[in-house]
Design a protein with these regions (language model features):
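Active-site neighborhood of HAD-like aspartate-dependent phosphohydrolases
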Residues: 1-41
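Conserved hydrophobic/aromatic "anchor" residues
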Residues: 5-7, 71, 100, 126
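Short alpha-helical
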Residues: 17, 46-49, 111-112
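Hydrophobic packing residues within well-ordered alpha-helices of enzyme cores
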Residues: 22, 51, 89, 113-117, ...
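Conserved H-loop
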Residues: 32, 61, 122-127
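A metal-dependent, Asp-based hydrolase signature
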Residues: 41, 45-77, 94-95
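Conserved ABC ATPase "signature" region
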Residues: 73, 118-121
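Short, acidic loop-to-helix structural element flanking the phosphoryl-transfer center
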Residues: 77-104, 110-114
Length: 130
């Protein structure tokens, strides 16, 4: 039995980096930036859905691919610029890790997830990351 956590919004506050990556991708495609609150309301269903919502392009439309690629590349390079642990998250992980196996389940790309976990000192707490 594992205690399973989500990452964004549960263990880390990644909103600022996601907003910045979204608006960077929009600007690269000649679109206007969106307010932070609008972008954060689009978060939670993966990068493809986020960029579809932000651009107004269907998830299945090939025209979404350039914006998605720009977002993913930018976010991968900047995923830890402003991302921080949620208040109390590290203390909770320390306490639980002493007694229970922990796992992480996220729709964030694996390489980016690993970078965030390592940068914030969280990777060692998890026996499984998916």
């Amino acid at each position: 039995m594992f205690v399973v956590f989500d990452l964004d919004g549960t263990l880390v506050d990644s909103r600022a980096d996601i907003v910045r990556a979204t608006n960077f991708a929009l600007a690269a495609g000649g679109r206007a930036p969106l307010p932070d609150q609008v972008v954060t309301s689009y978060v939670g269903d993966g990068a493809r859905t986020l960029m579809a919502r932000a651009t107004g392009i269907s998830e299945s439309d090939p025209d979404l691919e350039p914006a998605l690629r720009v977002f993913l590349d930018y976010y991968s390079a900047h995923a830890t610029d402003q991302t921080r642990p949620m208040t109390g998250a590290l203390a909770l992980l320390v306490t639980l890790h002493r007694r229970l196996p922990l796992a992480l389940c996220t729709n964030k790309p694996r390489r980016t997830t690993e970078r965030v976990l390592r940068a914030l000192g969280m990777r060692a707490f998890f026996q499984a990351v998916s």
